[in-house]
Design a protein with these regions (language model features):
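Alpha-helical scaffolding within the catalytic cores
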Residues: 86-94, 112-123
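Structural recognition of the beta-strand scaffold that forms the well-ordered cores
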Residues: 1-2, 53-57, 78-82, 104, ...
Length: 198
């Protein structure tokens, strides 16, 4: 998957970030399209055998205009991964297939700090849909807000401890890529219930 272009959310001029972040916006939908096209081309030069099918919005922010542009201009992007539980302006999702056919595959938790709220969210989602969806930035260990001050050993130990708990609590979970999990969401979304009373 891809995680935006220069970590800039796909948001047009005038998008309200509620004063929480200081991101630039895109002047036009065509500018957003050109940036993602450049990112897709660059990614294909690095990973020519891989198909990019997942878009993870930077800072979990995705405007309606940005989402529409992705759906219209990049048919290979079949999955969007925002968040299941939002705080402010984030792209909030359920596990489902949208009317335009794009699979909504939210993350439940992220990073390796794994505070009590994240553990609560993970526990609840295991009980609700028996899913663990976890996102890690490669640069988490370098970012103060995401744990760099704790150090690599602490972050690694946190993540190891979480994985030990997860596999102990939910041994039936399947390890899947976003593309594989997207197909599972498609199957889940198609489920129906029929009953016959006699």
């Amino acid at each position: 998957g891809i995680h935006g272009y220069n970590h800039m959310p796909l948001c047009p001029d005038g998008f309200d970030f509620l004063g929480k972040v200081d991101y630039e916006t895109w002047p036009t939908a065509n500018d957003m399209r050109s940036a993602i096209a450049e990112l897709m081309d660059f990614t294909k030069t690095l990973f020519p055998k891989n198909t990019i099918s997942t878009y993870v919005p930077p800072s979990n922010i995705l405007s309606a205009e940005g989402r529409a542009m992705l759906a219209e201009s990049f048919p290979e992007i079949r999955t969007l991964s925002g968040v299941f539980l939002k705080e402010d302006y984030e792209y909030e999702q359920e596990f489902c297939v949208s009317d335009d056919g794009i699979v909504e595959l939210p993350r439940i938790i992220s990073g390796a700090i794994l505070d009590p709220y994240m553990r609560w969210a993970a526990f609840n989602e295991l009980n609700f849909q028996y899913v663990n969806s976890h996102f890690i930035h490669p640069d988490d260990v370098l970012d103060e807000d995401r744990g760099a001050a704790l150090g690599w050993n602490t972050l690694r130990d946190n993540l190891d401890g979480y994985m030990d708990w997860l596999y102990g609590a939910a041994p039936g979970l399947r390890n899947q890529t976003a593309a594989e999990a997207s197909r599972a969401v498609q199957r889940y979304d198609c489920l129906t219930v029929d009953r016959t009373l006699e």
